[in-house]
């Protein structure tokens, strides 16, 4: 069950989504909290290269698949992700958030090791917000983040 404060608004659920995955190396993440943010059947979709010689492609994950993918990394590496800019559009009970992020290994690192954009689709059921999809791509030399997203 989600904490009502974490799902009461678009701001709250986006903040919770970043907070739950952030922590020091070896710090256990609250995966029940993570699960509580997502609508049943929700997807997390990193854009990545499946193999060294492959091009970018969406990697379709459910919440459990995402946890299985990142948990070993978090056990060995600090990971702190924070939102640095946002564009939100809403119609009725659906919302779309372009959320630009920076990632650091330590919360106080002066520079991020990675930046990118999360495309977050949300649903409001009349009582709370749910994450339906987070689809993201890291910034690269080939795909720098446009000023309108900063």
Each predicted region: which residue ranges?
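Short, low-complexity N-terminal intrinsically disordered segments enriched in polar/charged residues
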Residues: 1-37, 150
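Hydrophobic pocket/interface hotspot
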Residues: 17, 34, 42, 97, ...
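Short beta-strand segments enriched in hydrophobic/aromatic residues
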Residues: 21, 38, 101-103, 135-137
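Tryptophan-centered short beta-strand motifs
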Residues: 58, 110-112, 129-131
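Short beta-strand edge/turn micro-motifs at domain boundaries
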Residues: 115-145
């Amino acid at each position: 069950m989600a904490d009502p404060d974490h799902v009461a608004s678009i701001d709250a659920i986006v903040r919770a989504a970043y907070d739950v995955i952030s922590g020091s190396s070896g710090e256990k993440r609250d995966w029940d909290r993570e699960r509580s943010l997502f609508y049943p059947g929700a997807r997390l979709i990193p854009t990545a290269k499946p193999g060294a010689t492959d091009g970018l492609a969406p990697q379709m994950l459910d919440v459990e698949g995402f946890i299985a993918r990142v948990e070993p990394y978090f056990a060995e590496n600090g990971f702190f992700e924070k939102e640095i800019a946002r564009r939100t559009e809403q119609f009725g009970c659906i919302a779309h958030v372009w959320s630009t992020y920076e990632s650091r290994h330590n919360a106080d690192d002066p520079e991020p090791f990675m930046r990118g954009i999360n495309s977050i689709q949300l649903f409001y059921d009349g009582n709370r917000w749910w994450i339906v999809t987070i689809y993201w791509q890291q910034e690269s030399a080939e795909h720098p983040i446009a000023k309108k997203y900063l």
